[in-house]
């Protein structure tokens, strides 16, 4: 299978691409700056430069490709909501349309469990109502991107698959350390739970969506087996005391931040290789 990956310099992509190559896939990478992925070229990846906002620049990279794995995204900036929406919605739409025109058969898109709000009174399932006007730009931009892809699936029969990632960590990813200061900035409750997923299981889920038949137009959550409280997470880094207020009101929604992974398990046979944060910590896989 010939696969084009975007976002190869990001947290997920920089770990996913080497694993694809090690498994013998024919991998191409679309980047804006080829110098940032020279190590992947040494491993055998084909490097193409292009811009998601310039459809003509995408054509060489898409020629002969069987499937696209679209990982590129603009995450939290707190200052550039417009840029987040442009990258995550318009960039995704442009790439998908170019891929369809180029004859690509499958398009796998990484979204986020942050598309879910609160008040579901259970772990969030893929068919929950989400708010397209979510004030969080990252969340609303991912919802909009999902909608654009599903529209292409309905109108053109394009085989799109959407994977909503829980909080991704592991493989020396600094994501946890970077996020702990945000718990205080965003006034998060210490008892709030967060669902996590190790990079190994992101890879596992992406490969399942890449290779399995009969998943056209489907959306899946991916997470591990054991959500963890924000307090526990901060405490494991010695940061709990300076992150949370000593006095807190009761937690309003104990299910906020938790997702239901039963669909992915039933449809694909997915089972997390790293079932919890504590397993990863004890096995030195953080």
Q: What is the role of each PLM region?
A:
Residues 2, 205-261:
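Mid/C-terminal beta-alpha module of Rossmann-like enzyme folds, strongest
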Residues 3-23:
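N-terminal Rossmann NAD(P)H-binding glycine-rich loop of SDR-like oxidoreductase domains
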Residues 35-41, 45-89, 98, 118:
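NAD(P)H-binding glycine-rich loop region in Rossmannoid oxidoreductase-like domains
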Residues 93-137:
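Conserved Rossmann-fold NAD(P)-dependent oxidoreductase catalytic core, especially the SDR/UDP-sugar
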Residues 120-162, 188:
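Catalytic helix-loop patch of NAD(P)-dependent Rossmann-fold dehydrogenases
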Residues 143, 155-158, 168-179, 208-220, ...:
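Glycine/proline-rich active-site loop of Rossmann-fold NAD(P)-dependent oxidoreductases
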Residues 151-201:
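NAD(P)-dependent short-chain dehydrogenase/reductase
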Residues 242-286:
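C-terminal amphipathic/interface module of NAD(P)-dependent oxidoreductases
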